[in-house]
């Protein structure tokens, strides 16, 4: 390992969500359903958008990339958590812990930026509809996605750069089901005040700036929708409602953990479940239930397969 001689810890012990065997079985059943539904739902969205020509638009291109991020985010810690429910001593190697930190912050940072890109797409579609096809071309969408991934990776690397070489000489118990960055930093055998400030500044900057950008964007869009005729605004309002719901449910716990990362309460580990396990499920549920185009494409795909089986 590439850390100092003081760093004697080679693995971390994850305390998980509960020591009760009954609760662990209950959590296993619930989170297994959530995990499978999340992965299959997001895969279904990608498949539908890829094969339905009516969904060949910038909004759905960005949505398919959001689904891909959610699939990746579903797999960074949830499978291990499900296995750990049946293991008495839940451990993770130092390298595995650092990998979890890197993957989580990469995907979270990327998703934040992608949500901003989707808000911009809706702004152009509703407030400047005549220029939509000119502005929101394929090249710009690829640039948006590339920037989202670049920001996510840089955000994660900036965290990992000062975490990987911290001296960990014990204790090594992380009071969560995954390696949460603030909890890991607190285990370092040194004064971590400056590290905590750096984490707060880094995470707070990206989360608050993205959230404020989204709030401003959707406020302008809602004003634009209200100024339009009622007949032309219902579909736009339905799409906006789905987007705003995703933003609120995603950024709510996200800002809580990012702005107050080192002030921990017993309920925090259960909020982290929503943040890491349930958030990837929001995309397929909200977009499939509230988006008429996606629902129509789902039924079309279903009927196509049913007819092919009959023939």
Curated annotation (Swiss-Prot):
Record membrane topology: Multi-pass membrane protein
Superkingdom of origin: Eukaryota
A Gene Ontology term for the protein's cellular component: plasma membrane
Gene3D superfamilies listed in its UniProt record: Rhodopsin 7-helix transmembrane proteins (1.20.1070.10)
Annotated glycan sites: 5
Membrane-spanning intervals of the chain: 26-49, 58-79, 101-120, 140-158, 196-219, 236-258, 270-289
Membrane topology (Extracellular): 1-25, 80-100, 159-195, 259-269
Pfam families: 7tm_4
Record InterPro entries: GPCR_Rhodpsn, GPCR_Rhodpsn_7TM, Olfact_rcpt, Olfactory_Receptors
Cytoplasmic side: 50-57, 121-139, 220-235, 290-311
Cellular compartments annotated: Cell membrane
Disulfides per UniProt: 97-189
Coarse class of the protein's main subcellular location: membrane
Function: Odorant receptor.
Family named by the database record: Belongs to the G-protein coupled receptor 1 family.
Name of the molecule in the record: Olfactory receptor 4K1
Organism the protein comes from: Homo sapiens
């Amino acid at each position: 390992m590439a850390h100092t001689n003081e760093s004697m810890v080679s693995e971390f012990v994850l305390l998980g969500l509960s020591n009760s065997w009954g609760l662990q079985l209950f959590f296993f059943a619930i989170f297994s359903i959530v995990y499978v539904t999340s992965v299959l739902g997001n895969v279904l969205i990608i498949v539908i958008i890829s094969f339905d020509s009516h969904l060949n638009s910038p909004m759905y291109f960005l949505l398919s990339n959001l689904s891909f991020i959610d699939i990746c985010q579903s797999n960074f810690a949830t499978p291990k958590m499900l296995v750990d429910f049946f293991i008495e001593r839940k451990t993770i190697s130092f390298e595995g812990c650092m990998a979890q930190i890197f993957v989580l912050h990469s995907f979270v940072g990327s998703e934040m930026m992608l949500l901003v890109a989707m808000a911009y797409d809706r702004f152009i579609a509703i407030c400047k509809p005549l220029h939509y096809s000119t502005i929101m071309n394929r090249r710009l969408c690829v640039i948006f996605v590339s920037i989202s991934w670049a920001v996510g990776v840089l955000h994660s690397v900036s965290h990992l750069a000062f975490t990987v070489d911290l001296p960990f000489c014990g204790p090594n118990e992380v009071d969560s089901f995954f390696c949460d960055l603030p909890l890991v930093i607190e285990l370092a055998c040194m004064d971590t005040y400056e590290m905590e400030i750096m984490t707060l500044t880094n995470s707070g900057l990206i989360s608050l700036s993205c959230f404020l950008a989204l709030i401003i964007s959707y406020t302008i869009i809602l004003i634009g929708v209200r100024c339009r005729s009622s007949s032309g605004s219902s579909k736009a309002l339905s799409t906006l409602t789905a987007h705003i719901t995703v933003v609120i449910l995603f950024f709510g716990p996200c800002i809580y953990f990012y702005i107050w990362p080192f002030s921990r309460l017993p309920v925090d580990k259960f909020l982290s479940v929503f943040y890491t396990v349930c958030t990837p499920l929001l995309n397929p549920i909200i977009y499939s239930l509230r988006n008429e185009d996606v629902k129509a494409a789902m039924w079309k795909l279903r009927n196509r397969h049913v007819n092919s089986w009959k023939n």
